[in-house]
């Protein structure tokens, strides 16, 4: 069974980049009848908060990305300790006593020689007596994972294709701090093994991490999952944007963006498939394949999202929005108004046009025409086709046509020059209210 996981750190809110990661993990699991897991990587106990965790859950709920199970790394420290001891017994983790200042000095020396900042494994050469002396000074060791320099790192990425890393060109990663707390690398692997994760979907900034973690999977005697490393998002101008890092679900809600619009865009940008409006995210499962994703950065354009949002609103059924519409608006009202909306909450303004008071600046030369219109509106059959009947009668009586025929009527009846199709809107306004508005505009 396919098992994916979304593993945010609850040190902040979700932004558009990790919303995209969550979506693709969810889509891959759902498209293959698998499981989608939420894992809160909260090993940073100082910066992780329950408020942020709650906001992550709420954002996933708003998007409809409901996980099949949830776990918190802070509840799993005993498991990490157990697996760490296995690695320690194998000699695959080792204690290091350098201070941050000493490590920085080593990096500067290497940089001055034009060499990459690879850890020199000096800690492996320490004698028991030297370790004892360091600890007598009060130094507590941090721990590194010992990479196997004789095992080249290779995998076939679902997006990037064949990948190769030389472990001799990588530093042994620190997996545990001197205070005993955990860094990201090892707990992530331990959890992926324990949770049966089959596919790890994340950003391309994790490619080197994957190379390191593949050796951890092997050291722990576990099969490696498949990996898909996605190109990063850039703004509409084609550059990394600070704004993208601040765009989250709250911002999208404030813009009136429908969850399905955000999903429809993020599901397709960066792929060979066109971005299309859908009313149900399930329609996007067919054809969702990491082989369709390119390696070029994916452009996220807020204007494109807003345009897509409007197209989706124009196809949403009444049942999907009924709870967000103004009191009294029925299916006929929604279907009449929705072609003119860019966001659902604009419906209230158009419903006020139907039921509330309207006013407009009427040209003096149109007042007599509107008086005729009031009489004609009172005389026609309102059962069906009221707008067509009204304009036909007025055209025949006055000789007006085009804008001169229609615009004064729309202004008098709605107070606006543009809006929904009057064939659909006029029956909602109703005969009595329409006659009253026409007479008021004529006076």
From Swiss-Prot:
Its EC number is 6.1.1.17. One of its GO terms (molecular function) is glutamate-tRNA ligase activity. The keyword Coiled coil does not apply. A motif ('KMSKS' region) lies at residues 239-243. Keywords: Aminoacyl-tRNA synthetase, ATP-binding, Cytoplasm, Ligase, Nucleotide-binding, Protein biosynthesis. InterPro entries: aa-tRNA-synth_I_cd-bd, aa-tRNA-synth_I_codon-bd_sub2, aa-tRNA-synth_I_CS, aa_tRNA-synth_I_cd-bd_sf, Glu-tRNA-ligase_bac/mito, Glu/Gln-tRNA-synth, Glu/Gln-tRNA-synth_Ib_cat-dom, GluQ/Sye. It catalyses: tRNA(Glu) + L-glutamate + ATP = L-glutamyl-tRNA(Glu) + AMP + diphosphate. One of its GO terms (biological process) is glutamyl-tRNA aminoacylation. GO terms for cellular component: cytoplasm. It is found in: Cytoplasm. The keyword Aminoacyl-tRNA synthetase applies. A motif ('HIGH' region) lies at residues 8-18. ATP binds at residue 242. PANTHER family: GLUTAMATE--TRNA LIGASE (PTHR43311), GLUTAMATE--TRNA LIGASE, MITOCHONDRIAL-RELATED (PTHR43311:SF2). Belongs to the class-I aminoacyl-tRNA synthetase family. Glutamate--tRNA ligase type 1 subfamily. Monomer. Catalyzes the attachment of glutamate to tRNA(Glu) in a two-step reaction: glutamate is first activated by ATP to form Glu-AMP and then transferred to the acceptor end of tRNA(Glu). This is Glutamate--tRNA ligase 1. It comes from Rhizorhabdus wittichii (strain DSM 6014 / CCUG 31198 / JCM 15750 / NBRC 105917 / EY 4224 / RW1) (Sphingomonas wittichii). The lineage of its organism: Bacteria, Pseudomonadati, Pseudomonadota, Alphaproteobacteria, Sphingomonadales. The gene is gltX1.
């Amino acid at each position: 069974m396919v098992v994916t996981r979304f593993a945010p750190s609850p040190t902040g809110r979700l932004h558009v980049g990790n919303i995209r990661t969550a979506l693709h993990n969810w889509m891959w699991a759902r498209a293959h009848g698998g499981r989608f897991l939420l894992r809160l990587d909260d090993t940073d106990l100082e910066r992780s908060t329950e408020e942020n965790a709650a906001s992550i859950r709420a954002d996933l709920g708003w998007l409809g990305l409901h996980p099949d199970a949830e776990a918190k790394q802070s509840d799993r420290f005993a498991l990490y300790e157990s697996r760490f001891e296995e690695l320690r017994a194998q000699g695959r983790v080792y204690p290091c006593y350098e201070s941050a200042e000493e490590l920085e000095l080593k990096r500067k020396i290497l940089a001055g020689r034009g060499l990459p900042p690879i850890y020199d494994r000096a800690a492996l050469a320490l004698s028991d007596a030297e370790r004892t002396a360091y600890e007598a000074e009060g130094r507590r060791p941090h721990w590194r994972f010992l990479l196997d320099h004789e095992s080249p790192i290779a995998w076939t990425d679902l997006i990037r294709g064949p990948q190769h890393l030389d472990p001799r060109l990588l530093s042994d990663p620190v997996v545990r701090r001197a205070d005993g707390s955990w860094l990201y690398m090892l707990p992530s692997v331990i959890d992926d093994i324990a949770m049966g994760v089959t596919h790890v979907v994340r950003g391309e900034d994790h490619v080197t991490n994957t190379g390191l973690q593949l050796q951890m999977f092997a050291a722990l005697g576990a099969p490696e999952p498949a990996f898909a490393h996605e190109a990063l998002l850039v703004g509409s101008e084609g550059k990394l944007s600070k704004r993208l890092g601040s765009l989250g679900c709250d911002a999208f809600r404030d813009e009136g963006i429908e969850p399905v619009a955000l999903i429809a865009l993020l599901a397709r940008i960066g792929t060979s498939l066109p971005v299309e409006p859908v009313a149900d995210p399930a329609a996007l499962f067919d054809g969702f394949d990491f082989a369709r994703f390119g390696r070029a950065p994916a452009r996220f354009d807020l204007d494109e999202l807003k345009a897509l949002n409007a197209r989706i609103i124009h196809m949403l059924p009444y049942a999907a929005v009924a709870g967000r519409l103004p009191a009294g608006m029925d299916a006929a009202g929604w279907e009449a108004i929705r072609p003119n909306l860019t966001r659902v909450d604009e419906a209230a303004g158009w419903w006020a046009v139907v039921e509330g008071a309207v006013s407009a600046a009427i040209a003096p030369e149109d007042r007599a025409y509107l008086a005729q219109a009031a009489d004609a509106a009172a005389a026609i059959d309102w059962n069906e086709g009221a707008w067509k009947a009204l304009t036909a009668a007025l055209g025949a009586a006055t000789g007006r046509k085009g804008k001169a025929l229609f615009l004064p009527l729309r202004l008098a009846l709605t107070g606006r020059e543009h809006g929904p199709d009057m064939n659909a809107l006029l029956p909602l306004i109703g005969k009595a209210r329409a006659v009253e508005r026409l007479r008021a505009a004529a006076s």
